[in-house]
């Protein structure tokens, strides 16, 4: 693997998927100088379209891949990018504590919410499906977590909040 100069600034990319997390540190020329991986537990799947993960498992995986990077490399990180599975959503409080499980991209239980959306959304709107982020949000807000949550966040947004201490900014 090519190496960067020990004084080069590094940029860290964190990729969260459904089965694992990967971190790559690269220099400003795009040379990858370090890579780490961690596994995630499988999503909980149940009847009725349920597909959930616990956000705490995401955080443990992200923390693990960052911790595995050499300390000298971590000190040189100047910017960070996080991506995650699209349409994976959770509710949390102002401090980022999850108030709900994370409904994963393939969770399609929000049929009542998607029926509500279908009454007002254009026929070709992606918000109309039971797996849409809007349908998931309405479903969660109508449950117990909706009474205590202050933020609805996608996977990458929650991880960004955990890393920065700022939630609800994206």
Place the predicted regions along the sequence by residue.
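N-terminal glycine/serine-rich phosphate-binding loop of ATP-dependent small-molecule kinases
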Residues: 1-100, 148-150
């Amino acid at each position: 693997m090519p190496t960067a100069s020990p004084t080069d600034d590094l940029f860290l990319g964190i990729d969260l998927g459904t089965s694992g997390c990967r971190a790559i540190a690269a220099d400003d020329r795009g040379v990858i100088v370090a890579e780490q991986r961690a596994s995630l537990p499988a999503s909980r799947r149940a009847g009725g379209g349920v597909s959930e993960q616990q956000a705490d498992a995401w955080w443990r995986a992200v923390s693990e891949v960052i911790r595995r990077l050499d300390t000298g490399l971590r000190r040189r990180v100047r910017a960070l990018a996080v991506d995650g599975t699209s349409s994976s959503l959770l509710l949390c409080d102002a401090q980022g504590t999850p108030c709900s499980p994370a409904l994963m991209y393939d969770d399609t239980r929000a049929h009542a919410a998607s029926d509500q959306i279908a009454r007002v959304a254009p026929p070709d709107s992606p918000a109309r499906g039971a797996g849409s982020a809007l349908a998931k949000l309405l479903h969660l807000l109508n449950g117990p977590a909706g009474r205590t949550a202050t933020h609805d966040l996608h996977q990458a947004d929650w991880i960004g909040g955990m890393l920065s201490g700022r939630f609800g900014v994206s």
